[in-house]
Amino acid sequence: AAPKAPADGLKMDKTKQXVVFNH
Protein backbone atom coordinates (compact mmCIF):
# COMPACT_ATOMS: atom_id res chain seq x y z
CA ALA A 1 0.00 0.00 0.00
CA ALA A 2 1.25 3.45 -0.87
CA PRO A 3 1.82 6.04 1.87
CA LYS A 4 -1.33 8.00 2.62
CA ALA A 5 -2.08 11.27 4.35
CA PRO A 6 -2.29 11.09 8.19
CA ALA A 7 -6.05 11.65 8.18
CA ASP A 8 -6.54 9.21 5.32
CA GLY A 9 -4.07 6.69 6.69
CA LEU A 10 -5.73 6.65 10.08
CA LYS A 11 -8.85 4.55 9.96
CA MET A 12 -10.83 2.08 12.04
CA ASP A 13 -10.01 -1.44 10.98
CA LYS A 14 -13.04 -3.66 11.57
CA THR A 15 -11.00 -6.83 11.15
CA LYS A 16 -8.36 -5.87 13.71
CA GLN A 17 -10.95 -3.88 15.64
CA UNK A 18 -8.60 -1.13 16.31
CA VAL A 19 -7.07 1.84 14.84
CA VAL A 20 -4.54 1.05 12.14
CA PHE A 21 -2.04 3.33 10.44
CA ASN A 22 -1.56 2.68 6.74
CA HIS A 23 2.06 3.65 6.10
UniProtKB/Swiss-Prot annotation:
Annotated spans, Disordered: 1-23
Keyword Electron transport: yes
Cellular component GO terms held in the UniProt record: periplasmic space
Main localization of the protein described in the UniProt heading: periplasm
Coiled coil: none
Keyword Lipid metabolism belongs to the record: no
PTM: Binds 4 heme groups per subunit.
Official protein name in the record: Cytochrome c3-1
UniProt binding sites for heme: 23
Keywords: Electron transport, Heme, Iron, Metal-binding, Periplasm, Sulfate respiration, Transport
Source organism superkingdom: Bacteria
Function field: Participates in sulfate respiration coupled with phosphorylation by transferring electrons from the enzyme dehydrogenase to ferredoxin.
GO molecular function, one term: metal ion binding
Location(s) in or outside the cell: Periplasm
Residue ranges crossing the lipid bilayer per the database entry: none
